């Protein structure tokens, strides 16, 4: 499916997301990193919020290699997604509430933040085996990527989800018919 940095391992513009975070979310992330002593993540968060450094500058100041920077960005993106979705493990009812708020998420936030929230919601729905609700998420992701190369990717996921839902419904219908015929056979003896 999708990795934490987006479909096809494309790097999300983390700088853009961090600069668009509201003060409450940003301060919450900062506090979390201070509590857990995640100095590198805190440095990356503050640096992206206040300036636009090149990856080479970050690598030299943190004294890490490029693959470590990629991992650090990926983990920071995951933390931002968790903070935006307000919880790491949600009940089915809370997930349904988030699905019902998809239009609010898309219209009240920037595209980057909306995509981050929706990909986290997609991950949670997949974990909880809530495939019917994924249609709504993929539809929203498809609309958000209308004029990008990712449109085709989300369109394919949407179509795949429709096929899955139709197949599931047909299988349930066939099972019901089989049980009805089996019951008629048993009663006819």
List the model feature ranges, each with a label:
Residues 1-188:
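Flexible inter-repeat linkers and adjacent short helices
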């Amino acid at each position: 499916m999708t990795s934490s940095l987006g479909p096809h391992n494309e790097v999300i513009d983390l700088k853009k997301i961090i600069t668009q975070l509201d003060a409450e979310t940003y301060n919450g992330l900062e506090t979390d990193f201070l509590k857990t002593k995640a100095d590198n993540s805190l440095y990356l968060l503050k640096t992206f919020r206040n300036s636009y450094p090149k990856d080479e500058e970050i690598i030299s100041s943190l004294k890490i290699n490029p693959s470590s920077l990629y991992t650090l960005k990926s983990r920071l993106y995951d933390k931002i997604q968790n903070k935006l979705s307000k919880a790491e493990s949600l009940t089915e009812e809370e997930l349904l509430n988030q699905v019902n708020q998809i239009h609010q998420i898309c219209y009240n936030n920037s595209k980057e933040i909306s995509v981050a929230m929706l990909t986290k919601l997609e991950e949670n729905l997949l974990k909880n085996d809530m495939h019917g609700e994924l249609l709504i998420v993929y539809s929203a992701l498809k609309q958000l990527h209308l004029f990008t190369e990712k449109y085709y990717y989300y369109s394919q996921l949407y179509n795949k989800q429709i096929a899955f839902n139709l197949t599931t419904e047909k299988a349930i219908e066939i099972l019901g018919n089989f049980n009805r015929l089996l019951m008629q056979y048993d009663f006819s003896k």
